[in-house]
């Protein structure tokens, strides 16, 4: 059992809470039973799993630990409660924290089915919002989520947490805006941009064909280049005083409108 806060592996985990270290070491953190379970189900390779039985909250936690330990490439280490508290990113942890290699998440690896449904996030600033978007995208059955803002860190531990691990269960890609626009054009994927000043309501857009729902920043919206690239611009109606709604809520509304339209489509 690791009991020293000065242990090299403990220090590495603490470093990985910072983006620059995640990027330089090409490793990231996964904390929590549900999140680690979904990572394992998605065949994410676990390099190390740190456990603190004192914090276990589920009767089947040890089963997951044994499942990870069965991988010859994974190291499982028990740690003291003080050490785990030092490494943990969240409050009320359930005693499991894993280190895994950062995925490439390339656009070229993303499958494009006929009439695919995608979501493009151009500037989601808050990890909690991005995690919620991923969770909604998973629930709506999207074919992929594309993140194209250099300032957005998909591997932030709070993104993983807010997504409830669904970041591992749906296809995700990261690329610069120009590459994303070329990719969408190459695959004939229509761009439906969410813009508060659009003339049309979101329910008027045809989301039954291959399309990508485009979301910008809550504060500044979509930039000129993205607006010029959009095939359709739509807004969510608002009868209150707020000039915009939370970007994750907007994503959820539009994704489930797309799902509703597709469900009503007659099958061939």
What are the residue ranges of the model-derived segments?
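Glycine- and other small-residue-rich loops at beta-strand/loop junctions that grip anionic moieties
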Residues: 2, 28, 122-123, 148-149, ...
């Amino acid at each position: 059992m690791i009991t020293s806060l000065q242990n090299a592996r403990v220090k590495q985990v603490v470093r990985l809470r910072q983006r620059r270290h995640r990027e330089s070491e090409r490793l990231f953190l996964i904390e929590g039973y549900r999140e680690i379970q979904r990572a394992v189900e998605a065949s994410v390779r676990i390099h190390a799993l740190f456990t603190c039985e004192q914090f276990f909250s589920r009767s089947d936690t040890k089963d997951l630990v044994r499942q990870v330990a069965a991988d010859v490439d994974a190291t499982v280490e028990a740690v003291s409660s003080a050490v785990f508290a030092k490494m943990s990113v969240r409050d009320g942890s359930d005693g499991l924290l894993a280190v895994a290699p950062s995925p490439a998440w390339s656009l070229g690896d993303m499958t494009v089915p006929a009439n695919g449904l995608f979501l493009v996030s151009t500037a989601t600033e808050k990890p909690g919002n991005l995690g919620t978007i991923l969770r909604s995208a998973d629930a709506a059955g999207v074919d992929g989520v594309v993140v194209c803002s250099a300032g957005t860190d998909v591997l932030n531990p709070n993104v993983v947490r807010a997504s409830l691990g669904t970041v591992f269960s749906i296809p995700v890609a990261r690329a610069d805006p120009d590459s994303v626009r070329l990719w969408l054009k190459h695959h004939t994927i229509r761009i439906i941009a969410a813009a508060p000043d659009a003339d049309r309501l979101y329910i008027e857009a045809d989301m039954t064909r291959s399309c990508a729902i485009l979301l910008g920043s809550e504060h500044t919206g979509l930039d000129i280049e993205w607006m010029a690239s959009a095939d359709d611009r739509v807004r969510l109606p608002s009868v209150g005083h707020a000039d915009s709604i939370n970007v994750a809520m907007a994503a959820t509304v539009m994704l489930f409108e797309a799902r509703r339209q597709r469900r009503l489509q007659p099958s061939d």
